[in-house]
């Protein structure tokens, strides 16, 4: 009996772990947060034409908490109480959030946007794209939540993603950024890094600062000239690839904590006159050469960037498309993937959207609105579609938003994208749905699996 109790005590943590790991997922992981910021900055650095005033974007926990709180409400529509915050929405009926897919959905709208005229093609959405590349926006915070029922959408079991931005973008009549040489118009107090304007003294700069390293017990002395010992062993560090060392010449070396440099692939080592070391256990170098680490970070403008792999095929598409996806690694947004079938939705503005657009047109010019609410009647400008779709394409009208069931059969995962806007500027919010083959409400099977496994495990412990 004692053995059975011990066995059950061992099984209990395993059962709790099983239920915890297979339950509904809804919060963004640290990796997904990092990926969201990285993809925003990659897209911002690679805009064409190049931007002269594009700010580096960073994560903001307050915005993330605000976005998460709204995501918990499970509403497919923009937050009316978001104040002076920009907002992008994305939803997917699949097992967890797909950050690269969400970013590509938003960024693909660039082919409908005319930068010179600051207009969007009639019937298209550009608000996601313009918010992503809005030069003055430099803070982002996102939150996701699993919704068994998303208000405004007939589909069930949906993962909703909300991203908020500060300062907000999508100002009526204004371009997202100024064309020109990258970083040529950075604000005062900013410097250029990877074609983006980054604040001087930001946390990202910490790894670029040199550190004084006088203790290196893990390295062997390979050369010593005119060095003196004063009670402690001394050595000449001839190669320290993991550290950055400032010049120490003819001065006493004091003990300092070694600083680890995460990116220092190359270094130039020079010899300096020997320096005296006072007593400092366990080991103090008496001659420390100056090592200048030359960072060789790849430029975002020199070659195409391959984005992190996704469990889906992130085929960039307009915000009112339906595209099948399979389990294939993600590729660069500049490459198209075939052979997919896309259904292009209706291009007409919905009646309620037209009424809102007319009402918004009466506001002062300084009001911030979504660019695509007022589509231009002239032809699309210089930004052309760079992606080739080789699948069979047919047209199909959406009966009315937010009913998305008419755009695809409920046979797999779907993604919904709602354009970015500011309060009072909601436009033709037509969702896009992405169908998949091996998706589904995986959150249902987790608890059931735990319940099915519980009786056999208990019986095994008793007998």
Curated annotation (Swiss-Prot):
Molecular function (Gene Ontology), one example: peptidase inhibitor activity
Report residue spans for region: Disordered.
Answer: 262-281, 303-341, 383-408
**Posttranslational modification, per the record?**
N- and O-glycosylated. O-glycosylated with core 1 or possibly core 8 glycans.
Q: Where is this chain primarily localised? A: secreted
Q: Which GO terms describe its cellular component?
A: extracellular space
What spans are recorded as compositionally biased (Polar residues)? 392-408
Signal peptide span per the entry?
Answer: 1-27
Q: Describe tissue expression.
A: Expressed in prostate, testis, ovary and intestine. Concentrates in prostate cancer patient's sera.
- Matching InterPro entries, A to Z? Allrgn_V5/Tpx1_CS, CAP_dom, CAP_sf, CRISP-related
- Extract the PROSITE patterns matched here: CRISP_1 (PS01009), CRISP_2 (PS01010)
Identify its protein family.
Belongs to the CRISP family.
Quote the protein name from its UniProt record. Peptidase inhibitor 16
Specify the species: Homo sapiens
Q: Which gene encodes it?
A: PI16
